[in-house]
Amino acid sequence: CNYAGGQDELVFDGRSTAIMPDGHRIVARSFEEDFLVIDIDTDQSTRYNLLEGKRKGYDRKVEVEEINLKIPHRKSQEFLPEETYKYSSEEDDLIRSLELGLRDYVKKNGFKKVVLGLSGGMDSSLVAVLAVRALGKENVKGVMMPSRITSDESKKDAVELAENLGVETFEIPIESVFDSINGLMRPVFSDRPHDVTEENFQARIRGIILMGLSNKFGWLVLVTGNKSEMATGYATLYGDMAGGLAILKDLYKTQIYRVAERINEQAGTEIIPRNVFLKAPTAELREGQRDQDSLPLYEILDGILRLYIEESFSLDEIVSKGFDRKTVEYVLRLLQRSEYKRKQGAPGIKVSKRAFGKDWRMPITNRYID
């Protein structure tokens, strides 16, 4: 029988399978415990085995005790469950895998509640929905931490999502803390221009707030970053990377949009507000910032990353698939430069054939990309 449950980064999907002598398959449910009773005709099994020459000389290494029950008035056909498992879509499997991985990680590590930052963006919206589905709305806490950079649109989307989910939320503005840190560091920074340093102060302030809530109440902090960001280093160490579990760590940004669409389809309503799908992705750490100011379009970025990470394509092989060479070189440079961040990130749930973590053992110091 196959195990169904989560263990750290791994999720075991169940689907125990019985194959009848005639090739008919009976498959148990996926991502949950199941119980099947199957009646196998041993005489029929022997006949099928004898038809295959390769099995005639098979020497059974394990002794099996057969118990044959004679049931009065038994029908001549074997008992089969009325309905066996039907294979689902990739998005459905991803949703159930992430829910199971999160639920078991929380339960098996002694947590009861989780907390996450709600920015009004797609990643935090999806994490919030998955957490509610896995743990129940009463066990999920959302924190909105606006600054002067945060748009009214983002605030509205975060509030609407929280109301749709029915989760308890806290609003903790970070503007005064941000100003205080800038004032504290100004004499040290002297006349150096404003840059990503000050932008990252905002992310790190939010990380401090979330970890403070975790320490005080014993809540597990959920990281909301994705595989596209972790691959390219488009995340702030000790900021939005702070937390105990990154459930989207192995999903590319393009996958996240598909999974989110599927969740709304399943619900029959816009649990994740439509505006979250329509607006341009942004970290909102400076005025007018958009992800594509620093990264290629996600459709291009994810295509390059998938070929390199999952398929082990070389730079030249990726270019041969139609990608611009300079873009590929840029993406692979980002990937290599960000190794030190990935080494310090929270564990995430593995849903691909090669995830960052146990599957990805690359050095920080030495070059590995030509």
Predicted regions and their residues:
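CN hydrolase (nitrilase-like) catalytic-core segments centered on the catalytic cysteine
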Residues: 1-36
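ATP/NTP-dependent adenylation/nucleotidyl-transfer catalytic domains that generate, transfer
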Residues: 4-6, 44-119, 124-370
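A short, polar/charged loop-to-alpha-helix boundary motif
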Residues: 29-51
